[in-house]
UniProtKB/Swiss-Prot annotation:
Species whose genome carries this gene: Desulfitobacterium hafniense (strain DSM 10664 / DCB-2)
Source organism superkingdom: Bacteria
Free-text comment on the cofactor: Binds 2 divalent ions per subunit.
Name listed for the protein in its UniProt record: S-adenosylmethionine synthase
Residue sites binding ATP per the record: 15, 175-177, 241-242, 250, 256-257, 273, 277
Gene3D superfamilies the UniProt entry points to: 3.30.300.10
Cellular localisation: Cytoplasm
Length: 396
């Protein structure tokens, strides 16, 4: 039996980089609530006592960005100056411009439309907002069709915030990280080898109490007991102290947790971040579409694991390439799966936006604890509504 260990991490909503992701997406949502056709590329940076919001936004509506920033920080839990960062006293600076006219030219009217290659109906198609490649992944090793390590890391991080906000563990503070190492035998998860949790805390909380409480209230309620054994290792605040955290401890930036946002390193990544971007940016929308395709392929039973690569040219609606990789787990020929994908999914940016109904204020909720496998949310790219048709067309 081939054994191997695989590790993924997650972070809480109070992590500096995740604060930035949530602010960027909160601004996007606030704009989309008033102007669904807005173009938004919003970047955020945080450090001790300071938030800087910059980027390019083209819209016909007004949004109070400083108020949106402060409300987001308040909801995360930075509400006291003693935490080193406070929603009411931090400075908020903004530097916003409009989308480049050259980029808008390519997005507004796709290259195929300008060349007269599309029907009147298809002229509505939007050209890709940039070049690049995006990946989507799914596996049948969990009910969420996500790799087990990242699935558990997210659930632990979310639980860490829950016990803080509900005052079950009232000495916890917003910043925190989790990490899970899974042991695989013949590519199937069999046990948890290591769990790491680091959480910001009140200076008077002892290491012994933190360890005992986190095992009782976070680890054991989340991780299935059959995956734990006497050899499982637990590292709880392994430095021994985590009082200085959040933006006081580390500066944060939007888009710095792209592996946490996706598949925990189990799948490849094209390099583009999600938060703060409207769906004409294929970095976001095509990555969601690739997950949608991969999940439906696996849910249909066409493969046990599936990775989809999509690639685009700026201003061109049709993807320049679509690749299906099943890692030797396909039940039918991979080329046949590729044909089914092309026949059942519209992977032009306009097609993705329409299919997944992406011009809505749904993004802030995705900006912490992962964009995929979210059983706690009703996200359109997580639906398996194409699985039955794929299975029937595959003859299974």
């Amino acid at each position: 039996m081939a054994k191997k260990l695989f590790t993924s991490e997650s972070v809480t909503e109070g992590h500096p980089d995740k604060i930035c992701d949530q602010i960027s997406d909160a601004i996007l949502d606030a704009i989309f609530a008033k102007d669904p056709n807005a173009r938004v590329a919003c970047e955020t940076s945080v450090t001790t006592g300071l938030v800087l919001v910059s980027g390019e936004i083209t819209t016909n509506c007004y949004v109070d960005i400083p108020s949106t920033v402060r409300q987001t920080i308040r909801e995360i839990g930075y509400t006291r100056a003693k935490y080193g960062f406070d929603a009411d006293t931090c400075a908020v600076l903004t530097s916003i411009g409009e989308q480049s006219a050259d980029i808008a030219l390519g997005v507004d009217r796709a290259l195929e439309a300008k060349n007269g290659e599309m029907s009147e109906e298809e002229i509505e198609a939007i050209g890709a907002g940039d070049q690049g490649m995006m990946f989507g992944y799914a596996t049948n090793e969990t009910e969420s069709y996500m790799p087990l390590a990242i699935d558990l890391a997210h659930r632990l991080a979310r639980r860490l915030s829950e016990v803080r906000k509900s005052d079950i563990l009232d000495y916890l503070r917003p910043d925190g990280k989790t990490q899970v190492t899974v042991e695989y035998e013949d590519n199937r998860p069999v046990r948890i080898d290591t769990i790491v949790i680091s959480t910001q805390h009140h200076p008077e909380a002892t290491q012994e109490r933190i360890r005992r409480d986190l095992l009782e209230h976070v680890v054991f309620p989340v991780v299935p007991s059959e995956l734990l054994d006497e050899s499982t290792r637990y590292f709880i605040n392994p430095t021994g102290r985590f009082v200085i955290g959040g933006p006081q401890g580390d500066a944060g930036l939007t888009g710095r947790k792209i592996i946490v946002d996706t598949y925990g390193g189990m799948a490849r990544h094209g390099g583009g971040a999600f938060s703060g971007k409207d769906p004409t940016k294929v970095d976001r929308s095509a990555a969601y579409a690739a997950r949608y395709v991969a999940k439906n392929v696996v849910a249909a039973g066409l493969a046990e694991r599936c990775e989809i690569q999509l690639a685009y040219a700026i201003g061109v609606a049709q993807p320049v390439s679509v690749l299906v990789e099943t890692f030797g787990t396909a039940k039918i020929d991979e080329e046949k799966i590729g044909e089914l994908v092309k026949n059942n999914f519209d992977l032009r940016p306009a097609g993705i936006i329409k299919t997944l109904n992406l011009r809505r204020p749904i993004y802030r909720q995705t900006a912490a604890y992962g964009h995929f496998g979210r059983t706690d949310l009703d996200l359109p790219w997580e639906k398996t509504d194409k699985a039955a048709a794929l299975r029937e067309q595959a003859g299974l």
